[in-house]
Amino acid sequence: MNHIFKHIPVMKKELIDSLKIKKNGIYIDSTFGTGGHSNEILKKLGQNGRLYSIDRDPIAFSIGSEIKDSRFHIINENFSKLLDFAKNEKIIGKVNGIIFDLGVSSIQIDDYRRGFSFKNDGPLDMRMNPNYGISASEWLFESNVKEISFVLKNFGEERFSRKIAYAIKRRSQIKKITSTLELANIIKKTIPTKNKFKHPARRSFQAIRIYINQELEEIQKALESTLKILKPGGRISIISFHSLEDRLVKKFMIKNSTKAIIPYGMPITEEQLNRLTTCKLKIINRILPTQNEINNNPRARSSVLRIAEIQE
């Protein structure tokens, strides 16, 4: 099966270099996508190295299944199931590096039939795995103004969330909103456009997508699981594309690289004390894209790469 997707990985060299790949190490690509990062890791692995890749998207899984390499294994699953997967593969505490390239992939955004794009018309779906969950169209139809407004405000940081929610429900009372351009045009007519370079529906589409796919919950669960999966000295490298993702990643890294403060006189066992005062992570770096990369790949503009390491 041939798959053609136009995809330029963001900060690919920086991400791969951050892993400090060991030839016979074990690595996990938590967001396979079109395989750009996985293929780079495989190039650096020796004969006894191993790479496991995960992606919830069936098309990404199909692309990965075409890689015929005994060192490589891919599963069609949410990355929140990383810990279960690692247990099944008996690699808990043995992994040298884990990468995440968060957000929507080119597989989803480039194919109008997936319903992610506010620029090209398609069915209003937005599910990263179309076989599970409720579509964006169904959710908007079934939800009330308060629920829609909450999602737009909290997951899209949309200032006009309530105004947009009212407009969506007014249209829904006439007919269900079933296409991406229909939704985009409702939003465009509802709120003022100050920046001609940024589509007024951008934040709302982001918010609905994040909610439909439970992205923030998935990220949080996956991040916590890395602490058990990685070996001492193992690295976690994460590229995020908007402030909600980056805030979550930053908070996770700071929390696990800072010793807890125990109130004086608080009764606590020695085991609990060791657990509370031992840092699990060491923050290595925060990298932003170069201006040259942003010029060549505008999607890189909002990206942030954060790197941390399990304490030896």
From Swiss-Prot:
<protein>
    <recommendedName>
        <fullName>Ribosomal RNA small subunit methyltransferase H</fullName>
        <ecNumber>2.1.1.199</ecNumber>
    </recommendedName>
</protein>
<keyword id="KW-0949">S-adenosyl-L-methionine</keyword>
<feature type="binding site">
    <location>
        <position position="55"/>
    </location>
    <ligand>
        <name>S-adenosyl-L-methionine</name>
    </ligand>
</feature>
<dbReference type="GO" id="GO:0070475">
    <property type="term" value="P:rRNA base methylation"/>
</dbReference>
<feature type="binding site">
    <location>
        <begin position="35"/>
        <end position="37"/>
    </location>
    <ligand>
        <name>S-adenosyl-L-methionine</name>
    </ligand>
</feature>
<dbReference type="Pfam" id="PF01795">
    <property type="entry name" value="Methyltransf_5"/>
</dbReference>
<dbReference type="InterPro" id="IPR002903">
    <property type="entry name" value="RsmH"/>
</dbReference>
<dbReference type="GO" id="GO:0071424">
    <property type="term" value="F:rRNA (cytosine-N4-)-methyltransferase activity"/>
</dbReference>
<dbReference type="InterPro" id="IPR023397">
    <property type="entry name" value="SAM-dep_MeTrfase_MraW_recog"/>
</dbReference>
<keyword id="KW-0808">Transferase</keyword>
<comment type="function">
    <text>Specifically methylates the N4 position of cytidine in position 1402 (C1402) of 16S rRNA.</text>
</comment>
<feature type="binding site">
    <location>
        <position position="79"/>
    </location>
    <ligand>
        <name>S-adenosyl-L-methionine</name>
    </ligand>
</feature>
<keyword id="KW-0698">rRNA processing</keyword>
<keyword id="KW-0963">Cytoplasm</keyword>
<feature type="binding site">
    <location>
        <position position="108"/>
    </location>
    <ligand>
        <name>S-adenosyl-L-methionine</name>
    </ligand>
</feature>
<comment type="similarity">
    <text>Belongs to the methyltransferase superfamily. RsmH family.</text>
</comment>
<dbReference type="InterPro" id="IPR029063">
    <property type="entry name" value="SAM-dependent_MTases_sf"/>
</dbReference>
<feature type="binding site">
    <location>
        <position position="101"/>
    </location>
    <ligand>
        <name>S-adenosyl-L-methionine</name>
    </ligand>
</feature>
<dbReference type="GO" id="GO:0005737">
    <property type="term" value="C:cytoplasm"/>
</dbReference>
<keyword id="KW-0489">Methyltransferase</keyword>
